Amino acid sequence: MPSRTIQKQNNRALWVILIAAVAVRLVLAAATAGYPYDMSCFIAWGDKLFTEGPANFYSEGYFADYPPGYLPVLAAVAGLRKLFGVAGDGPVGRVLLALVPSVCDAGLIALVHCIARRRMGESRQTFCLTLFTAFCPLFLFDTGLWKQIDGAFVLPLALCFWLLENRRYLPAALLYGVALSIKPQALLAGPGLAVCLPAGVAAA
């Protein structure tokens, strides 16, 4: 079979995996309640930002322990809920909260597939790794069941280190800033970036 035909078939298979991965996460999101503490925070933060605007969000005495990078997404979700009269803790509201992290998970799956394909070609190992990333129980639990937003900061963080490997230092640093603006846990990767970035620049 010509290599171009194989590549087209594999690209179609990748799209099927991506769509299925997002669909599974959204079905889980609709069917489960999520982690109640974080769910209530996400809903309240979105409502506050949507109604009061960014200038009044970090107000004295108001609990908000997330940086501002992801808050506009929560505000957009709040706006959609108000527009269509959707309850935040209902199935549709939960799907809206899980939508962006699920799409970011799909972006991570595509990135893993592209890296694996460069290293291993159009092989069974490449698709096994892609499938594992798509349906890893940890990712499904985090995004689909708990409704966490980790996918939204893991994607730019993974892209950051991929760009570092390819010696594209400025875009890598910018993407690390994006990840850090979404969730402070990106600081855990800071030491690695602090070593890799200066070493790469010096080697260049």
Q: Where are the regions a protein language model picked out?
A:
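Start-transfer (signal-anchor) and selected internal transmembrane alpha helices
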Residues: 1-27, 111, 117-118, 126-128
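Extracytosolic helix-loop segments that constitute the early lumenal/periplasmic catalytic or substrate-binding loops
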Residues: 38-65, 69, 77-87
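Transmembrane-helix motifs of polytopic, lipid-linked glycan transferases
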Residues: 95-120
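Short acidic/glycine- and proline-prone juxtamembrane loop motifs at membrane-interface regions
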Residues: 144-150
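Perimembrane helix-loop-helix junctions
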Residues: 188-204
